[in-house]
Amino acid sequence: MNRLKEKFQKEITPALVSKFNYKSVMEVPKIEKIVINTGVGDAVSNSKALDNAVEELTQIAGQKPVVTRAKKSIAGFRLREGMPIGAKVTLRGEQMYEFFDKLVSVSLPRVRDFRGVSKKSFDGRGNYTLGVKEQLIFPEIDYDKVSKVRGMDIVIVTTAKTDEEARELLTQFGMPFQK
């Protein structure tokens, strides 16, 4: 069993039950899924850029991403409906806990001038969105093989009803929020 999952069952659940006075342990919020999304603007003119992004996302997540396509045409961007413009991957279960552990303990501390993640990135429903400016913070990415520095969005979906519950859950998991 994953280190974080074990910590969740043995330490975090009892702590959250006592803090928020839940009647049942089933009310305790948990991380449902993590969605990693990357947009590839160059994909319109250069189809190889998308292949590189998919390859990097596969290395980071340990799972093959789905190619996202344009919903509608935008003439200003030379974009047609249905053109591939990005990639996303949804992690659940073991892989989700493994990725989250790696993100919190290895990747985020590698960000330049890192002072913690923003407390304001909750959406009001207990989900947290984190923008990463470069894929180089992940240990799986080889610096020499990177063709272009790409950012990505990481969305952590929880079963929490409020932002306060979700913030407490992620803090217990070791998410480094700003002071």
Swiss-Prot record:
Part of the 50S ribosomal subunit; part of the 5S rRNA/L5/L18/L25 subcomplex. Contacts the 5S rRNA and the P site tRNA. Forms a bridge to the 30S subunit in the 70S ribosome. This is one of the proteins that bind and probably mediate the attachment of the 5S RNA into the large ribosomal subunit, where it forms part of the central protuberance. In the 70S ribosome it contacts protein S13 of the 30S subunit (bridge B1b), connecting the 2 subunits; this bridge is implicated in subunit movement. Contacts the P site tRNA; the 5S rRNA and some of its associated proteins might help stabilize positioning of ribosome-bound tRNAs. The keyword ATP-binding does not apply. GO terms for biological process: translation. Disulfide bonds: none annotated. HAMAP family: Ribosomal_uL5_B. One of its GO terms (cellular component) is ribonucleoprotein complex. NCBIfam families: PRK00010.1. GO terms for molecular function: rRNA binding; structural constituent of ribosome; tRNA binding. Belongs to the universal ribosomal protein uL5 family. Keywords: Ribonucleoprotein, Ribosomal protein, RNA-binding, rRNA-binding, tRNA-binding. This is Large ribosomal subunit protein uL5. It comes from the Bacteria. It comes from Bacillus cereus (strain G9842).
